[in-house]
Amino acid sequence: MNGMAKIAAVVPPVTDPRGFPSMAVYVATHKRATLPRSDWLTPIGLNGYRDENVRTCDADGADNIAHLNRSYVELTGLYWLLKHCRDDYVGLCHYRRFLTFTPPPAPDINYPAVFPMDTTDETFDYLASDEQKNRMLSLLDTYDFIVPRPIIYPETVATSFVNAHGELFWDRFLRSCQREFGHDVSYFDQETRFYCGNIFVTTPEKFRQFAKSLFRVVDHVYAELGEIEDMPEVRYAPHRYPGYIAERFMGLYIHKMGLRVFETPMVWLN
């Protein structure tokens, strides 16, 4: 798709002839925020976000879906990476949600799926450290994807989604998944875990395969339903349903493709 709006990517100084660092986890942000900085954590501006204090790479005229940002949210960044990223390793996180690849600096050894940390220099140093990068790269020698530890619900993925977002989106999503993978999508009626945030790290080829499959499913649903303005009966912002169904898609994709995944805590910045 070609968007009429803009999507901006904030990139660090060039470190190789292609113009990209060899390894990058892109940090999606739609506003000015204090972020951990390193040669492998790369802010990417969504929804037309600009920051005059850093280098900004405009995608004007390039293949993007920035005009869908209200509904697709962080998926607009994921689409931009699919079309333009040339890193040796690629990942996506958010300005308040980061993956951690080494134990957090805290005494609790039973880390939850989501680990809150204060927004301090010490936290940023920890998240952007070489130790994190090296551990991440070593994990990718063994695993296909690094993903957040899953959120575990007392009910199935299907039931929890319908309770939160309603049956309309779920029904269309299941039909689209069946178009992509075949009739059997019983995974959702058996699994109680899901990977939140559309957050991951992987290799370029595995990313491209995943992203193309994801957008075939999500775009088909959006083509049927379009932008949803108001649904009083659902709990969360209904216009963001493409992002919500994408979160559930990741678990199904991992299951169907038989991928090896490493599940790691997600840091939530207070």
Model segments located where?
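ER/Golgi luminal nucleotide-sugar-dependent glycosyltransferases, focusing on the catalytic module
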Residues: 2-270
